[in-house]
Amino acid sequence: MEENIVNILKSIGEDPTREGLLNTPKRVKKAYDFLTSGYHVDITKVVNGAIFEESTEGMILVRDIEVYSLCEHHLLPFYGRAHVAYLPNKKIIGISKIPRIVDVFARRLQVQERLTEQIAYAVQEVLDPQGVAVVIKAKHLCMMMRGVEKQNSELFTSCLLGAFKENMVTRSEFLDLIRTGST
């Protein structure tokens, strides 16, 4: 990868041997290794057995999870917030595992639509809950810095499974909670 970065620098008219760029290929490789590390992560290892028998029936929501990913079309970042909820079916998950699941899929080349679904289906697979809801709101630098240059635009995506898809009351409760944050 480092050699390819040197070639990119040359192709845009830069001198990869100048002081400020000498270590750039190494830094870019290290950054991309981290930003795409989700390809090499097994969700079961992320969850690490942190699933517990519990009779609670109320909605469990982790709000405002920071999301940083790379658009697969331009390799530019998009960033925002994810809200992930589930209705338990006699099992709950350690709350830190939800943001970790988000990170696994965000640390890949992505489109936000697929990212939203991958998170929802991963939670569904791990917990087998009565339902899962994921909403992501993000800003895409590929749309802000280039192309249409719309700096204030945001993309909202959602994936609703089970009770969140089938039951309007459950869906409304989720949407109210992510809008206001109040109970």
UniProtKB/Swiss-Prot annotation:
PROSITE patterns: GTP_CYCLOHYDROL_1_1, GTP_CYCLOHYDROL_1_2. Zn(2+) binds at C71, H74, C142. Its EC number is 3.5.4.16. InterPro entries: GTP-CH-I_C/QueF (IPR043133), GTP-CH-I_N (IPR043134), GTP_CycHdrlase_I (IPR001474), GTP_CycHdrlase_I_CS (IPR018234), GTP_CycHdrlase_I_dom (IPR020602). One of its GO terms (molecular function) is zinc ion binding. Pathway: Cofactor biosynthesis; 7,8-dihydroneopterin triphosphate biosynthesis; 7,8-dihydroneopterin triphosphate from GTP: step 1/1. One of its GO terms (biological process) is tetrahydrobiopterin biosynthetic process. It catalyses: GTP + H2O = 7,8-dihydroneopterin 3'-triphosphate + formate + H(+). Transmembrane segments: none annotated. Belongs to the GTP cyclohydrolase I family. Toroid-shaped homodecamer, composed of two pentamers of five dimers. NCBIfam families: folE (TIGR00063), PRK09347.1-2 (NF006825), PRK09347.1-3 (NF006826). This is GTP cyclohydrolase 1. It comes from Leptospira borgpetersenii serovar Hardjo-bovis (strain JB197). The lineage of its organism: Bacteria, Pseudomonadati, Spirochaetota, Spirochaetia, Leptospirales.
